[in-house]
Amino acid sequence: MSSEAKTLQAIKFDRETKTLDILDQLLIPYATEYISIKSIEDAYQAIKLMQVRGAPAIAIVGAFSIVVDVYNNLKETKEKSRTIGDLVESIHYLITARPTAVNLSNACLDIEKLILTEFKKDELVNQHTFDIVYQYSVALYDDDLDNNFKIGDNGLHYIVETLKSQSFTGPFSIITICNTGSLATSGHGTALGIIRTVFKKLSKDAGEKFWLEHVYPCETRPYNQGARLTTYELNYEGIPSTLVCDSMASSLIATLSKQRKVKSSTAPVKFIIAGADRIVENGDTANKIGTFQLSTIADYFNSRAEKENTIKFIIAAPRTTIDFKTKTGDGIIIEERPSQELTTLNGPVLTNNGVLEKQTVGIATPGIDVWNPAFDVTPHELIDCIVTEDTNAFVKNSEGDFNLKV
């Protein structure tokens, strides 16, 4: 485990030494420490404990963990006895760390398919096995980073065209949930990547007719990824932002729509942008719990607003997040997390002299029954646009359906 200054680099894979280190996101924003991942088991535990999270990031970490696992096994074991069947079994085990996020499953199954195309299950893992896994994983990382910048540009284009069609001028705000930035991906991010790009390229100082003035990250209970991670990234980038509780979204939108100040800003909310852990064929989207709630809030305000004052609900994700095998959201398996994530809070004790070690504090009646789904499913009917790395953002046709296969 290593410590260093504030950073947004969630994944460090050294292509020369074949070593993998991940930023322990449970410690952010109060500490920056990296954990060494030397095996598939290490990755499973880190993903399960949410030391690394975000659908693209866990897929990349999962793939790289197979790389270092095979590399270390070949380097350290004199008598080679590990079979391809053993490796495939370990890969299937890795998938179970986070079942809702399709990216991890897709990456692992892609690797399995590539391996089984070249080897039989009773053959031994060898250097060629490593080469196959390495080449796939490096390409996965590089493609994800490139695609995230494309998502940012495509999201910017959709936002500009939307505001032009509404004849909107002046400052506007965006709401987001969970963490979808550099910490959740190879870099830049998806939903937060769009926010980064929009803030950089739509500037009042540059003479634009409209500009992003403020971002409102929802805290994202019960794991507080918005409060811990998204605020960390927004602060790092110098993007003006105000943290709100998940239950404040309706009041926030209503207050700003009446040109009343929230802190120092009156810029109305024009967009809600969320990421995705799984998008199925019809556009139904599984994302962090609370996303569905935000879409219904937007729908409520839109039903009472003039067309030029509506709020667009945007999903941002790479195409690797799309699951064409599942037709509707009813087929998505929703992961349930441990009850103590809801009944306790974990964090460092803060004093005038600095930060003390992390402690756990109870906040609910001992023994109370708990339902703690990690994700919910937003129906495609409530989504205005799905932004991927494809040039054209996906909007619904006249029948209200997405065609994601185009």
UniProtKB/Swiss-Prot annotation:
Active site per the UniProt annotation: 277 (proton donor)
Primary location recorded for the protein, binned into one broad class: cytoplasm
Regions annotated as coiled coil: none
SUPFAM superfamilies for the chain: NagB/RpiA/CoA transferase-like
Hydrolase found in the keyword field: no
Top-level taxon in the UniProt lineage: Eukaryota
EC number: 5.3.1.23
GO CC annotations on file: cytoplasm; nucleus
GO-annotated molecular function: S-methyl-5-thioribose-1-phosphate isomerase activity
Pathway involvement of the protein, from the record: Amino-acid biosynthesis; L-methionine biosynthesis via salvage pathway; L-methionine from S-methyl-5-thio-alpha-D-ribose 1-phosphate: step 1/6
Catalyzed reactions: 5-(methylsulfanyl)-alpha-D-ribose 1-phosphate = 5-(methylsulfanyl)-D-ribulose 1-phosphate
Alphabetical UniProt keywords: Amino-acid biosynthesis, Cytoplasm, Isomerase, Methionine biosynthesis, Nucleus
Site (Transition state stabilizer) residue list: 178
Subcellular location field: Cytoplasm; Nucleus
Cross-referenced InterPro entries: IF-2B-related, IF-M1Pi, IF_2B-like_C, Initiation_fac_2B_a/b/d, M1Pi_N, NagB/RpiA_transferase-like
One of the GO BP terms on file: L-methionine salvage from methylthioadenosine
Family: Belongs to the eIF-2B alpha/beta/delta subunits family. MtnA subfamily.
Function, in words: Catalyzes the interconversion of methylthioribose-1-phosphate (MTR-1-P) into methylthioribulose-1-phosphate (MTRu-1-P).
Alphabetical list of NCBIfam families matching this protein: eIF-2B_rel (TIGR00524), PRK05720.1 (NF004326), salvage_mtnA (TIGR00512)
Protein name: Methylthioribose-1-phosphate isomerase
Species annotation: Debaryomyces hansenii (strain ATCC 36239 / CBS 767 / BCRC 21394 / JCM 1990 / NBRC 0083 / IGC 2968)
Gene: MRI1
